Design a protein with these regions (language model features):
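GGW-centered surface loops in extracellular recognition modules
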Residues: 1
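Substrate-binding/active-site clefts of carbohydrate-active enzymes
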Residues: 6-209
Length: 209
């Protein structure tokens, strides 16, 4: 059963981070659509607790495993680069957030929107296993977060941090073809000849990556 964790159930409002993002808030960002409909490109509060609380619902449908979206740390702000996101638009990132988990900035750190007091990732998997439900983890090693076209560089976007929180890669708000990996160590994590919308494209040929 595939779960976009943030979109499933808000089991613990204390981890919603509703004030996060400062001038570029990241919680509950509605997009108006036709006939009174709307979409949302912000965080909405789904978390590990929400999944644990609804395991019987999942099992009653006949599922024996839950495939969840990435759990790694994503940027705290809404993205300011790219084309503004509108109802039904594709490849438009301005105003969007990393609620889906696919804009990783620290692959060693659990995103703060997911755990609760007494329920970290180990506790989450233990709770599912206790119900005889397996956990399938979505892992993205192809790219990081959106990395350029911002009016001014934003914290975390286009950056990668190591296990100790030290910055090891930074696209510095530059398009891929302007990166200089030969002379700038912070550019060496990224490909400099291909572009994936505004995403930082990880260089799979670099052993450090």
């Amino acid at each position: 059963y595939f779960v976009v964790t943030d979109r499933f159930v808000n089991g613990d409002e204390s981890n919603d981070q509703r004030a996060q993002g400062g001038a570029h808030p990241s919680f509950d960002i509605p997009i108006a659509g036709p006939d009174g409909r709307s979409d949302n490109i912000g965080y909405l509060g789904g978390d590990f607790q929400g999944i644990v609380d609804h395991l019987d619902y999942i099992k009653d449908m006949g599922f024996g495993a839950v495939w969840i979206t990435p759990i790694i740390d994503n940027p705290d702000q809404a993205f300011t680069g790219g084309t503004p996101a509108t109802w039904g638009s594709m490849w438009t990132d301005q105003g969007k957030t990393g609620y889906h988990g696919y804009w990783g900035v620290n692959f060693y750190r659990l995103d703060e929107h997911l755990p609760s007091a007494g329920l970290d990732f180990a506790g989450f998997t233990a709770a599912l296993h206790a119900k005889d439900v397996k956990v399938v983890l979505d892992i993205v090693a192809n790219h990081g977060s959106p990395a350029f076209t911002m009016p001014a560089a934003q914290p975390q976007y286009g950056q990668i941090f190591d296990a100790g929180g030290t910055l090891v890669a930074d696209q510095q708000n530059l398009p891929a073809d302007r990166l200089d990996p030969a002379n700038n160590p912070l550019h060496r994590f990224y490909n400099n000849k291909t572009e994936m919308v505004q995403l930082s494209d990880l260089n799979e040929n670099n052993p450090a990556v």
